[in-house]
């Protein structure tokens, strides 16, 4: 239900709708006959968050006027329009530019009084279609919400310098340990009557010196071979100690020992020539500790033997000529039976039995037609000679474990009786 806004001196900024859908009349707006029932609270209306007194409304409007003076370009409505307030029945409609709406999150108008905040033009929602705010926000809370400060701890370079100093001291200790070891190797090589130039070439080619200067020309093959033999023969016990040292150097890639040296016309890393010696020597140490040479062989799984098929000796075989003769005789009997049946009223089952009886008696006893069920021939599945037992003999052979056959009498086999002889 929509009603027009009517200014009045008594309301001074608040115009209420009729109570409980009461009939509205223009005569009630006369100054002489004012209806005091409009000033009373309607059903369900109380002094809640959306109920303001006249003094509170005036204070809020003064605050808005002050903010408009600071920002004359603000997109707020004029003061005359903001004084017209409209309330819906039981909170179902949203008033136009009410003081509550200025504090609501749906209002984009000027609401802060500090000149540091940026203002957007005011956005008002249409009556009866916008979402109703569940709780009115306090103006001071809204200002504090917009002025949240983010504090970040300043950068402290001393902390990073201390961490870097620790890493540098650790790397320097590792490099000093590594450089001490080649010095002993150089002394051993000098004892083997090697010139100092050759010893410096060997140490520099291995990439152990901090200068890591590569030789201009290819080194002598004798010096390389002697140095490799010296490392493999005299450093077998120190191989376990050498591997963690080089792993630490690989972890700290900031050391100056990561250069490459020229060897036989190709570039190789200084660590690639050292690690294979230590790894191979560690394997030899493990083999010496075990007392015998370890041969790593691939273990095979369990081999299942393949059963070979046994040859069947007792299965009768027929030549193709014998099979062709049996086929022709069978066809002749079938055609003769169709042309001159024995009994035309015997039916399909009787006719089949008569045909099978003829085939059974006319052919050789060694040959059995696949559809002939008068004899049971399991020669293909048995490997021993067939033995015939009576029922009692069969029970005695099975030690009378089947109690249901104890009371059955023994009876001999009877001859096969065809259906047409009955």
UniProtKB/Swiss-Prot annotation:
**What segments bear the compositional bias annotation Low complexity?**
274-283
Q: Biased-composition ranges for Basic and acidic residues?
A: 80-90, 231-241
Keywords, A to Z, come to: Nucleus, Phosphoprotein
Q: Does the keyword Ribonucleoprotein apply?
A: no
In its UniProt entry, the species of origin is given as: Bos taurus
What domain of life?
Eukaryota
> Assembly state and interactors?
Interacts with S100P.
The cross-references to Pfam families, in alphabetical order and at most eight, read: S100PBPR
Q: Where is this chain primarily localised?
A: nucleus
What name does UniProt use for this protein? Answer: S100P-binding protein
Q: Which PANTHER family match?
A: ASKOPOS, S100P-BINDING PROTEIN
Q: Which residues carry this modification: Phosphoserine?
A: 195
């Amino acid at each position: 239900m929509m009603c027009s806004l009517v200014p009045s001196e008594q309301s001074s900024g608040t115009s209420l709708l009729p109570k409980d859908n009461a009939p509205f009349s223009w005569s009630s707006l006369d100054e002489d006959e004012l209806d005091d029932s409009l000033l009373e609270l309607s059903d369900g209306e109380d002094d809640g968050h959306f109920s303001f007194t006249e003094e509170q409304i005036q204070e809020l409007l003064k605050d808005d006027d002050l903010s408009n003076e600071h920002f004359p370009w603000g997109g707020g409505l004029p003061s005359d329009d903001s004084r017209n307030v409209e309330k819906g029945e039981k909170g179902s409609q949203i008033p136009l530019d009410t003081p509550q709406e200025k504090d609501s999150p749906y209002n984009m108008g000027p609401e802060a009084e500090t000149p540091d905040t940026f203002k957007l033009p005011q956005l008002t929602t249409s009556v009866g279609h916008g979402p109703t705010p569940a709780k009115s926000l306090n103006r001071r809370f809204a200002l504090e919400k917009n002025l949240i400060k983010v504090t970040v701890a300043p950068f402290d370079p001393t902390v990073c310098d201390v961490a870097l100093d620790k890493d540098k001291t650790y790397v320097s200790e590792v490099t000093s340990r590594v450089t001490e070891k080649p010095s002993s190797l150089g002394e051993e090589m000098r004892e083997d009557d090697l010139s100092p130039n050759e010893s410096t070439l060997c140490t520099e080619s291995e990439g152990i010196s901090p200068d890591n200067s590569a030789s201009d020309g290819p080194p002598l093959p004798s010096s390389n071979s002697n140095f490799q033999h010296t490392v493999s023969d005299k450093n077998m016990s120190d191989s376990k100690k050498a591997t963690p040292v080089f792993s630490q150097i690989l972890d700290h890639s900031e050391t100056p020992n990561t250069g490459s040296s020229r060897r036989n016309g190709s570039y190789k890393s200084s660590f690639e020539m050292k690690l294979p010696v230590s790894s191979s020597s560690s394997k030899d140490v493990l083999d010496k500790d075990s007392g015998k040479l370890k041969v790593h062989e691939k273990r095979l799984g369990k081999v299942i033997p393949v059963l070979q098929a046994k040859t069947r000796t007792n299965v009768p075989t027929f030549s193709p000529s014998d099979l062709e003769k049996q086929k022709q005789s069978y066809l002749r009997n079938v055609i003769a039976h169709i042309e001159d049946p024995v009994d035309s009223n015997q039916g399909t089952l009787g006719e089949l039995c008569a045909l099978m009886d003829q085939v059974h008696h006319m052919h050789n006893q060694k040959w059995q037609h696949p559809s002939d069920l008068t004899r049971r021939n399991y020669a293909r599945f048995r490997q021993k000679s067939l033995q015939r037992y009576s029922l009692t003999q069969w029970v005695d052979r099975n030690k009378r474990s089947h109690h249901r056959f104890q009371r059955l009498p023994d009876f001999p086999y009877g001859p096969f009786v065809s259906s047409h002889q009955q």
